[in-house]
């Protein structure tokens, strides 16, 4: 993080704090240790705006702190995938131009294809394998939880993240839209 800008470091701090607050106070529990997690929509917004490094650390630090404050201990096998989701979505930073007021239907499709793939890899593969390797959890249980998390987070980011990005893009002036009178 030697060349990381102050703006990115501040974004990581704010994003991780929002991740913790939303994760602790707005979870929709489905079954044991598995919730619909609205904080991933905010992480997606920050990841697109500030890039993969910010996205990774927002998810990693935010999830770690959320687990610590929740009192059930840090589940590292799920902390890492939260970071990977931000890393993957953050890879779209230079491709999407939401900071310039542009978020077209093609951009929405690209965003949602990438986030769906990243969620599937992170939650349906990485998290369950981590649970098995680190915690010796039963495979059928963790792959069920992982698949649910992948679909729930894809749905959450697909709706919430897309709406946040549309709102953000609409709040930015488009290039060439301002003229001197």
Curated annotation (Swiss-Prot):
Alphabetical UniProt keywords: Cell membrane, Membrane, Transmembrane, Transmembrane helix
Gene3D superfamilies named among the record's database cross-references: 1.10.1760.20
GO cellular component: plasma membrane
Main location class: membrane
Disulphide-bonded residues: none
Membrane topology (UniProt): Multi-pass membrane protein
Location(s), subcellular: Cell membrane
Transmembrane region(s): 11-31, 45-65, 69-89, 114-134, 147-167
Family: Belongs to the UPF0397 family.
Name of this protein: UPF0397 protein SUB0313
Record organism: Streptococcus uberis (strain ATCC BAA-854 / 0140J)
Lineage of the species this protein comes from: Bacteria, Bacillati, Bacillota, Bacilli, Lactobacillales
């Amino acid at each position: 993080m030697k060349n990381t800008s102050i703006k990115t470091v501040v974004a990581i701090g704010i994003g991780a704090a929002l991740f913790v607050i939303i994760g602790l106070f707005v979870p929709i529990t489905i079954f044991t240790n598995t919730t619909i997690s609205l904080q991933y929509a905010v992480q997606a917004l920050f990841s697109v705006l500030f890039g993969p490094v910010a996205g990774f650390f927002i998810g990693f630090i935010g999830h770690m702190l959320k687990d610590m404050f929740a009192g059930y201990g840090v589940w590292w096998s799920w902390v890492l995938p939260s970071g990977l989701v931000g890393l993957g979505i953050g890879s779209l930073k230079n491709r999407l131009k939401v900071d310039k007021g542009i978020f077209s239907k093609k951009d929405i499709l690209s965003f949602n294809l990438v986030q769906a793939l990243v969620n599937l890899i992170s939650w349906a593969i990485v998290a369950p394998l981590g649970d098995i390797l680190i915690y010796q959890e039963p495979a059928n249980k963790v792959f069920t939880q992982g698949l649910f998390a992948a679909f729930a987070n894809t749905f959450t980011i697909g709706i919430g993240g897309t709406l946040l990005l549309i709102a953000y893009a609409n709040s930015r002036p488009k290039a060439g839209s301002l003229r001197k009178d």
